[in-house]
Structures are given as C-alpha cells and as structure tokens.
Amino acid sequence: MEYVLIVHAVKDYKAWKQIFDDAAVIRKKAGEQSYYVLRDENDANRIVHFSKWSSLARAKAFFESPRLVEIRRLAGVEAPEFNYLHSLEQGTL
C-alpha cells in the first residue's frame, strides 16, 4: 500500500477545509483512495493530511502539478511538507 503524509500550516482552517472538500472528486480521479485529516493539539491551523493512494507515482504527479500548486495557494497553505510512504506492516492491538 502507498501513502502520503502532508503536514502544513493553513491561514484559516475552515477556508482550507472547504477547498479540500471541493477537491474530493479530483483527488479521487488522481488515485487517492482514503484519507484522514488531523489537527495539531496546540495549533488549530497546523494540519496533517494522511492518505492512501493507488500509487506513489500518481500521488506525486498530482501533488506536484501546477493545478494543485494553485489550489494550495488559494487554500492558504503555508510550507507543505510531503512524505511519500510505502507500507511495511500494519497491525491491530
């Protein structure tokens, strides 16, 4: 399984979330299969987007596209950190 972990600050969570939700169709078309949105315990505008993808190549192409750069700018995203991850193990305790 392939995952992407993105950590970034946003100027306004509600505005960011609306744009994030509006982009659901294009994220799905690009290969995103599921996601979590998490928020920092001490900073409501520091967001983590953790998602499962059909392939890392598709995820990279999507997140590095000019269209997504513009969407992030409109959403008020500041300095995103992208981590492209391969699953090694999963368990339940």
Language-model features and meaning:
Residues 1-70, 74-93:
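Short S/T/G/P-rich N-terminal loop/turn motif that feeds into the first structured element of a domain
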